[in-house]
C-alpha cells in the first residue's frame, strides 16, 4: 500500500512537469493540429496506405485492417514489489518405462444369445363336426341353429390316413363323460379321399374330405350333420426352455417338443397323462400332396381335447443351441492388461473386455454347437488368409466378454517368428551345426503338419507354443525398451531446457515469466526467485501518443521508445480504480514497451542519432518513426513475417465414422415369440372363410349384474344372514331369469308360434261346446242326463184310445207308460250305482295300499277287515230288493 501511494505521488509530479514542458519547450516540428499531444489511438481506424507527412492523430484515424493477426490488447505493467513471487521447478528424475502392453493377434468368432425360436413341422389331425338346423317353407332355407366343434382322430385311423390317404366319414368322440357318434350327411360310414384345400398359406397346408356344412329340405325343419376330416401341415415354434410350443392356428400345446418316455435323465415338461402320448418307432408318413411315403422315423403323437398332433421325435442337444454365431473377425487383437483382456475388432469399431481365465464352455446348457461352429469358421478363415504365412498357436480359447458375448479366439504366429526362435534356442543349447539343421527340420516337420485346412501344430503343440511365446516376448521386450529410451530421452531434454530457463530469467525476466504464465506479467529478480506482478489491460481509448520522441529541454537526448499518456480504466475489474474512485481521471506518463506493454515512466533514453528509423508495435499495427518523429502507421501485413516455429511432421488421427451395429435384426426380433402374429391372423381369416354362413351371435344382458350387486349389498351389510339372503335372491332371480329366457326362446321359435295359435283356436271351440252343454243341462237336465226318456218338445203325442175304448182301457194304457218310465229310471239308477261302486272299490284299493305302506313303516299288523272293507248299499237299493 505504501509503494502504491508513492507511485501516485510520482505520477502527479510527472504530470505537472509534463504540462510545464509542453507549454514552454514544445518542439517546432510538431504540427499545429496536434499541439504536441496525439489524440486517442484506435488502431481499428487506421489505414494501410502511406499518406505521407500527416499528424499522428490523422494517421490513427485512417482505419485498421480487416483481418488482424496480432492481438489488439495493450497492458500496463508496474514494477513488482515482491508481494507475489515464483520459482522455477527443479529437474525431475527420469523414469525408465520398461513395461509395455502385450498384444496377441489371431482370429475371433463372436457368439451371441440365440433368441430365435425352434421351428419344426407338425401334422394336425381332427374332424370338424358341424350340426346345422334349417327351416324352409317353399322358399329359401334359413339357418336357425348351428353347432361347430373339433374332435381328435384316434391313432388307428391316423395310421389308415397316412397309409391310404383316406379318412372315415364317421366321428367318435367323448364329451361330458359320454361317447357320441356323428356321421357325415347322416349317412352310413364310408371312406372319403383327402383332397387339398384351396385356402393355404406359406406356413400351413390343409387337406379335407368335404366342403358342405348345411343340408335342407323343401318344407319344415331339418337338422343335418357334416363331418369334415382335416389334416394340416403346420409349423410349430418353441422358445427356451422349450416347455411348450405353439402353432400357426393359435393353439398351444403344453408339452415339450423333446418329450420322451424312454429317458434316463430328467423328463421334460408335460401336463398330459401318459395314455395321451404315444411314441412309435419306424413310423412312415405319407405326403398327402405328392403321395410319396417318407423314410421311417420315430414319431410322436399327442391326443388333445380338439385334435391329435404328430411330429418327429428329436434329440434336444442336436436340434437346438442357446448360442448363435454373430460375426467372424479375421483380424483380431487381444491386448493384455493387468486384470483383463481386451479384444479389439477394428473392422467392427468395437472392443470386448473379459477376464484372463478362459471360460469353461461345458458349463453352458445346450451349447454343444459352439465348438463345431467356431472350429468350422476359424478353419475357413485360416485356409483362405493365413495358411501360407502363419501357424496356429494352441487350441481355440473361449472368453466370456462384457455384455453377454462369447468370444472364440485362435492365436496365430508367423513363420518368421517361429524360425527365429528355433535358431535362438539352438544357439543357447550349443548344438553342432549339422545336427542343428537336422533337428530343426525334424521339429518343423513334427510340429507343423500341412493339411487341407492349413498348417497346424499337433505333436509338440504346447512346447512349440511356449517357445514361440518366448520369441515373441523377446521381440516385445526390445520394442518396449526402445519406447522407454525415447521417453527417458525426452525427460532428459526437459531437464536440460530447464537450465536454459534459469539463465534466461537473469536476462529478461519479463519475457520469460510472460511466456510461462501465458499472460502479460511484470517480473524482476529477487535473488533466486522472481517477483511477479499482473499487468492491467488499458483500453485503447485511454491512450494518447506523442508525435515526437525527442526530450524537451535537451536536443541531444531522445527517447528510445515512443512516449505516451494513459489512464487506468474506471471499470470495477481494474485494480487501480478499486483503491480510489478519482484515480481514473489521473493522466500517467509512460512509454510504449515491447509486445503492447506500457512502461510507467520515461526512463528509456539515448543520444539522438542521425537517420533514425524505427518501427514500434501498437495494437495490431506498427508505428513508423523517422528522425524521432511519427511518420505513419504501417499494417502488419506489409511487413514480411519470419516464423521461428518448426512444423512437426506428424500424422493426425483419421476420421472414423461410428456406424450402428445391430446385434439382432428386425427379422430375428419378430421371430422371438412362440406365436407369429401374422401367421395367426392369416390362419384365422382363412378359417373364417371356410364357413361363410356363420353369423355373429349377440347375447343381451339378462340382468345378472344387477342381482349380483344386490346380493353383494346384502352380504356386505347384513353379514352371514345377508349372504344367505343374497344367495336366496340370486337363486330366485336365476330361476325367474331362466323361466323368462325359456319362454322368450320358445316364443321366438316359429313352430312355437304356430302351435300356440292352433291351441288357442281349439280352446275357443272347446269352450263354446262346453258352454252349450252347460246351458242344455240347466234347461232340461233329464233329457241331457237320460236322452230318450222324455220325448223332445214338438213330438206329437201317441194317439189315445179313449175315444174308441172304455175308460178301463185308457187307465191301463197310462199305467203301462208309467211302468216303462220307471223301468228306465231304475236302469239309470243302476248304472249310477255301478259307477259309484266302481269308484269306491278303486278308492278302497288305494286306501288299502296306503294303509299297508303305513303299517309297513310302523310295523303294525294288518287285519283282514282292513284289507277287504265291506261295501254299504244305499237304502233305495234295499227297498228295490224287497219289492
Curated annotation (Swiss-Prot):
Q: How does it sit in the membrane?
A: Single-pass type I membrane protein
Q: Per the record, where is site Cleavage?
A: 438-439
Record-given protein name: Envelope glycoprotein B
According to its record, what are the GO cellular component terms? host cell endosome membrane; host cell Golgi membrane; host cell plasma membrane; membrane; viral envelope; virion membrane
Q: Where is this region: Hydrophobic membrane proximal region?
A: 694-748, 724-744
Motif Internalization motif covers 868-871
Does Secreted show up as a keyword for this record?
no
Post-translationally, this protein is described as follows, namely: A proteolytic cleavage by host furin generates two subunits that remain linked by disulfide bonds.
A Pfam match: Glycoprot_B_PH1
Query: Quaternary structure?
Result: Homotrimer; disulfide-linked. Binds to heparan sulfate proteoglycans. Interacts with gH/gL heterodimer.
InterPro entries per UniProt: Glycoprot_B_PH1, Glycoprot_B_PH2, Glycoprot_B_PH2_sf, Glycoprotein_B_ecto_C, Herpes_Glycoprot_B
Query: Into which family does the record put it?
Result: Belongs to the herpesviridae glycoprotein B family.
Instruction: Give any single GO term for biological process.
Output: symbiont entry into host cell
Topology feature Virion surface, residues: 32-750
Entry keyword set: Disulfide bond, Glycoprotein, Host cell membrane, Host endosome, Host Golgi apparatus, Host membrane, Host-virus interaction, Membrane, Signal, Transmembrane, Transmembrane helix, Viral attachment to host cell, Viral envelope protein, Virion, Virus entry into host cell
Where is this protein primarily located? virion
Which residue ranges are assigned to the Intravirion compartment in the record's topology? 772-883
Amino acid at each position: 500500500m505504501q509503494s502504491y501511494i508513492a507511485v501516485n505521488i510520482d505520477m502527479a509530479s510527472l504530470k505537472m512537469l509534463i504540462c510545464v514542458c509542453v507549454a514552454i519547450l514544445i518542439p517546432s516540428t510538431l504540427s499545429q493540429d496536434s499541439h504536441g499531444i496525439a489524440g486517442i489511438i484506435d488502431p481499428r481506424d487506421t489505414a494501410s496506405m502511406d499518406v505521407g507527412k500527416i499528424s499522428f492523430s490523422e494517421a490513427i484515424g485512417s482505419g485498421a485492417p480487416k483481418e488482424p493477426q496480432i492481438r489488439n490488447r495493450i497492458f500496463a505493467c508496474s514494477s513488482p514489489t515482491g508481494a507475489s513471487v515464483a520459482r522455477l521447478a527443479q529437474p525431475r528424475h527420469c523414469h525408465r518405462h520398461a513395461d509395455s502392453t502385450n498384444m496377441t493377434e489371431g482370429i475371433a468368432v463372436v457368439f451371441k444369445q440365440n433368441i430365435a425360436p425352434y421351428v419344426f413341422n407338425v401334422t394336425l389331425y381332427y374332424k370338424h363336426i358341424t350340426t346345422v338346423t334349417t327351416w324352409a317353407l317353399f322358399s329359401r332355407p334359413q339357418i336357425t341353429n348351428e353347432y361347430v366343434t373339433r374332435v381328435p382322430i384316434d391313432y388307428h385311423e391316423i395310421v389308415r390316413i397316412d397309409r391310404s390317404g383316406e379318412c372315415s366319414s364317421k366321428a367318435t368322440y367323448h364329451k361330458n363323460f359320454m361317447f357320441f357318434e356323428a356321421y357325415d350327411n347322416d349317412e352310413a360310414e364310408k371312406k372319403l379321399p383327402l383332397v387339398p384345400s384351396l385356402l393355404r398359406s406359406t406356413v400351413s397346408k390343409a387337406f379335407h374330405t368335404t366342403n358342405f356344412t348345411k343340408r335342407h329340405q323343401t318344407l319344415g325343419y331339418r337338422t343335418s350333420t357334416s363331418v369334415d376330416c382335416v389334416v394340416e401341415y403346420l409349423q410349430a415354434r418353441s422358445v427356451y426352455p422349450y416347455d411348450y410350443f405353439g402353432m400357426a392356428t393359435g393353439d398351444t400345446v403344453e408339452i415339450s417338443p423333446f418329450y420322451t418316455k424312454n429317458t434316463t435323465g430328467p423328463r421334460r415338461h408335460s401336463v398330459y397323462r401318459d395314455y395321451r402320448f404315444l411314441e412309435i418307432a419306424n413310423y412312415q408318413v405319407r405326403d398327402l400332396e405328392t403321395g410319396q411315403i417318407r423314410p421311417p422315423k420315430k414319431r410322436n403323437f399327442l391326443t388333445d381335447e380338439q385334435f391329435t398332433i404328430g411330429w418327429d421325435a428329436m434329440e434336444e442337444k442336436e436340434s437346438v443351441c442357446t448360442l448363435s454365431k454373430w460375426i467372424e473377425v479375421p483380424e483380431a487383437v487381444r491386448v493384455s492388461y493387468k486384470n483383463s483382456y481386451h479384444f479389439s475388432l477394428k473392422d467392427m469399431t468395437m472392443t470386448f473386455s473379459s477376464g484372463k481365465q478362459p471360460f469353461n464352455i461345458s458349463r453352458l446348457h445346450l451349447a454343444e454347437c459352439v465348438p463345431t461352429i467356431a472350429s468350422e469358421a476359424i478353419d475357413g478363415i485360416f485356409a483362405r488368409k493365413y495358411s501360407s504365412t502363419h501357424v496356429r498357436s494352441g487350441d481355440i480359447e473361449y472368453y466370456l466378454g462384457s455384455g453377454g458375448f462369447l468370444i472364440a479366439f485362435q492365436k496365430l504366429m508367423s513363420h518368421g517368428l517361429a524360425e527365429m526362435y528355433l535358431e535362438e534356442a539352438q544357439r543357447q543349447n550349443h548344438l553342432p551345426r549339422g545336427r542343428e539343421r537336422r533337428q530343426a527340420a525334424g521339429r518343423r516337420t513334427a510340429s507343423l503338419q500341412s493339411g487341407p485346412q492349413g498348417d497346424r501344430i499337433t505333436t509338440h503343440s504346447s512346447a512349440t507354443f511356449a517357445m514361440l511365446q518366448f520369441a515373441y516376448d523377446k521381440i516385445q521386450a526390445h520394442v518396449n525398451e526402445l519406447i522407454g529410451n525415447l521417453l527417458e530421452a525426452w525427460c532428459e531434454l526437459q531437464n536440460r531446457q530447464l537450465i536454459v530457463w534459469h539463465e534466461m530469467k537473469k536476462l529478461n525476466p519479463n519475457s520469460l515469466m510472460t511466456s510461462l504464465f501465458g499472460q502479460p506479467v511484470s517480473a524482476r529478480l529477487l535473488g533466486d526467485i522472481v517477483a511477479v506482478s499482473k499487468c492491467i489491460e488499458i483500453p485503447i481509448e485511454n491512450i494518447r501518443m506523442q508525435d515526437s520522441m525527442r526530450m524537451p529541454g535537451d536536443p541531444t537526448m531522445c527517447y528510445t521508445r515512443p512516449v505516451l499518456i494513459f489512464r487506468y480504466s474506471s471499470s470495477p475489474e481494474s485494480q487501480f480504480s478499486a483503491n480510489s474512485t478519482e484515480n481514473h481521471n489521473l493522466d500517467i506518463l509512460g512509454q510504449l514497451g515491447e509486445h503492447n506493454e506500457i512502461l510507467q515512466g520515461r526512463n528509456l533514453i539515448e543520444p539522438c542519432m542521425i537517420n533514425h528509423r524505427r518501427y514500434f508495435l501498437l495494437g495490431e499495427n506498427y508505428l513508423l518513426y523517422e528522425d524521432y518523429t511519427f511518420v505513419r502507421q504501417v499494417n502488419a501485413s506489409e511487413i514480411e513475417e519470419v516464423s521461428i516455429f518448426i512444423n512437426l511432421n506428424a500424422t493426425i488421427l483419421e476420421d472414423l465414422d461410428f456406424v450402428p451395429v445391430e446385434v439382432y435384426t428386425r427379422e430375428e426380433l419378430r421371430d422371438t415369440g412362440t406365436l407369429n402374429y401374422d401367421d395367426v391372423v392369416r390362419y384365422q381369416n382363412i378359417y373364417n372363410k371356410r364357413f361363410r354362413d356363420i353369423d355373429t351371435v349377440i347375447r343381451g344382458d339378462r340382468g345378472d349384474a344387477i342381482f349380483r350387486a344386490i346380493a353383494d349389498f346384502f352380504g356386505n351389510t347384513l353379514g352371514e344372514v345377508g349372504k344367505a339372503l343374497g344367495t336366496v335372491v340370486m337363486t330366485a332371480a336365476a330361476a325367474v331369469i331362466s323361466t323368462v329366457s325359456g319362454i322368450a326362446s320358445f316364443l321366438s321359435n316359429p313352430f312355437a308360434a304356430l302351435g300356440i295359435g292352433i291351441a288357442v283356436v281349439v280352446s275357443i271351440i272347446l269352450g263354446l261346446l262346453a258352454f252349450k252343454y252347460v246351458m242344455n243341462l240347466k234347461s232340461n237336465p233329464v233329457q241331457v242326463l237320460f236322452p230318450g226318456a222324455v220325448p223332445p218338445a214338438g213330438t206329437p203325442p201317441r194317439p189315445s184310445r179313449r175315444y174308441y175304448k172304455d175308460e178301463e182301457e185308457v187307465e191301463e194304457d197310462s199305467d203301462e207308460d208309467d211302468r216303462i218310465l220307471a223301468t228306465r229310471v231304475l236302469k239309470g239308477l243302476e248304472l249310477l250305482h255301478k259307477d259309484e261302486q266302481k269308484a269306491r272299490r278303486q278308492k278302497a284299493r288305494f286306501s288299502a295300499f296306503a294303509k299297508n305302506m303305513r303299517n309297513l313303516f310302523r310295523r303294525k299288523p294288518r287285519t283282514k277287515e282292513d284289507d277287504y272293507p265291506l261295501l254299504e248299499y244305499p237304502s233305495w237299493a234295499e227297498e228295490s230288493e224287497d219289492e
